[in-house]
């Protein structure tokens, strides 16, 4: 297993400087890093003098982070837990929460975890290594259900064609490897020379989100952060695709009282604002960062500042994703 310090050398957390500037961690500030991963944000927060509770559902991340715990003892506590439960790890409210949504670099780098089509491995994709795998989904769900997953969670334009191909081919040979699935999708859809995005990208995204219930996890995590932040506390969320970013944008919009209005609909009465958003439109990577860290290309940071108002009820309808709310994802 790769040690934490070795990972830190190769791992560059995206939008690190905007995250630190936005969260403004003071010496002694209590911060929750809900997505520890390779420890990039946590390490930077600790160096700024903060006290950090870092969560990750991936046991590999927790194991690899023990050297960091020793280095920064007693200011770092690592907990194997989903970030949707972050309000259960402290009794007092905190100064900041940071969430880096999606798959981590170290998960993508390890072929045996089955997250990447660029490195052949078992069709797994489980962050916590419990529950059903991506292979289970691909080999057992009906084509209409696969198409729904690919279309909604991956925003894949060829969702139906890909789902029907999978249903037909798995009768002869089940999909067991990431390379098998990626090759089959590329053979079906085709790929023009110079195409930067592999045709299997959105399908792999959709499967990963479904297997790990990432949409439900994000929604519950936003509500949990609202409950646990002090007045003036800051919530930062880094997302990597439009579905996640729309959820975060909508959350801050509704919680700030600036919900999407329409001249065709009656005015919506809103509760007292629990957040006000910073940096309208969010923050994306600078040209300098893009050159140093290409992974930051699709990243967007949104930050909200907690008000003194009481936390509001957790209502999934807020996100306008009724068709997604029925997905149980990794809870099966």
From Swiss-Prot:
The keyword Ubl conjugation does not apply. GO terms for biological process: rRNA base methylation. Pfam families: Methyltransf_5. The keyword Transferase applies. GO terms for molecular function: rRNA (cytosine-N4-)-methyltransferase activity. Its main location: cytoplasm. Keywords: Cytoplasm, Methyltransferase, rRNA processing, S-adenosyl-L-methionine, Transferase. This is Ribosomal RNA small subunit methyltransferase H. It comes from Bartonella grahamii (strain as4aup). The gene is rsmH.
């Amino acid at each position: 297993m790769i040690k934490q310090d070795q990972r830190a050398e190769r791992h560059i957390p995206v939008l690190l400087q905007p995250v630190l500037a936005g969260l403004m961690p003071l010496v002694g500030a209590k911060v929750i890093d809900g997505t520890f991963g390779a420890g990039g944000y946590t390490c930077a927060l600790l160096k700024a003098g903060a006290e950090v509770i870092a969560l990750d559902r991936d046991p590999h991340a927790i194991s690899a982070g023990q050297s960091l715990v020793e280095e920064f003892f007693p200011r770092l506590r690592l907990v194997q837990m989903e970030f949707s439960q972050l309000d259960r790890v402290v009794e007092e409210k905190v100064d900041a929460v940071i969430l880096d949504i999606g798959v981590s670099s170290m998960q993508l780098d390890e072929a045996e975890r089955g997250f990447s089509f660029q490195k052949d491995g078992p069709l797994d994709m489980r962050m916590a290594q419990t529950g059903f795998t991506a292979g289970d989904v691909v080999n057992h769900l009906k084509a209409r259900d696969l198409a729904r997953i690919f279309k909604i969670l991956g925003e894949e334009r060829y969702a139906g064609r890909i789902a029907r191909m999978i249903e037909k081919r798995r009768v002869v040979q089940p999909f067991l490897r990431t390379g098998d699935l990626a090759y089959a999708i590329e053979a079906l859809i085709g790929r023009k020379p110079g195409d930067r995005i592999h045709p299997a990208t959105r399908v792999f995204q959709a499967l990963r989100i479904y297997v790990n219930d990432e949409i439900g996890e994000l929604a519950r995590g936003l509500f949990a952060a609202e409950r646990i932040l002090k007045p003036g506390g800051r919530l930062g969320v880094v997302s990597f695709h439009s579905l996640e970013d729309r959820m975060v944008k909508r959350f801050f919009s509704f919680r700030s009282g600036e919900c999407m209005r329409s001249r065709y609909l009656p005015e919506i009465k809103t509760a007292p604002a629990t957040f006000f958003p910073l940096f309208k439109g969010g923050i994306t990577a600078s040209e300098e960062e893009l050159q140093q860290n290409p992974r930051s290309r699709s990243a967007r940071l949104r930050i909200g500042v907690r008000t003194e108002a009481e936390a509001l009820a957790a209502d999934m309808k807020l996100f306008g994703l009724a068709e997604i709310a029925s997905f149980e994802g990794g809870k099966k």
